[in-house]
Amino acid sequence: VRRCGIIAFAVLVICASTASAENLLAGADIGYGEYLSGECVTCHSQTGVDKGIPSINGLDAEVFASVMHAYKTGDMEHPVMQMVAGRLDDEQIASLAVYFSKLPGSN
């Protein structure tokens, strides 16, 4: 249910955003995303399955990037995620988005 809410929010952000999906994923490097993923998988487990913490494995790259940008700008509220996203630049977000989108989802 929570994953659906996140996806719905991200779709609205993508539709309302002046930045295209291409811009959200500009500079993406899957290898760099894998390198950066260590902090993410501390909470979002490698298997992508955890009670209470949404799975990010297999999440559409555009959705992932939109959600991370929403946390970064404060449009979505969650203290930990705002802190994490706030430390990432656009290339890092894009690289993480592409990396996690290529992992098998938990659904």
Regions found by a protein language model. Give the residues of each.
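C-terminal capping alpha-helices of c-type cytochrome domains
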Residues: 71, 86-107
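Residue-level hotspots at or immediately adjacent to binding/recognition sites across diverse folds
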Residues: 21-22, 46, 84, 99-101
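Positively charged n-region of N-terminal signal peptides that target proteins for export
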Residues: 2-4
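The canonical Cys-X-X-Cys-His
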Residues: 33, 38-46, 96
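Electrostatic cytochrome c docking/interface patches
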Residues: 17-37, 104-105
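Gly/Gly-Pro-rich "capping" loops immediately C-terminal to redox-active cysteine motifs
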Residues: 30, 34, 48-77, 82-86
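Residue-level marker of structural boundaries
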Residues: 42, 61, 73, 102-105
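Bacterial N-terminal signal peptides
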Residues: 7-16
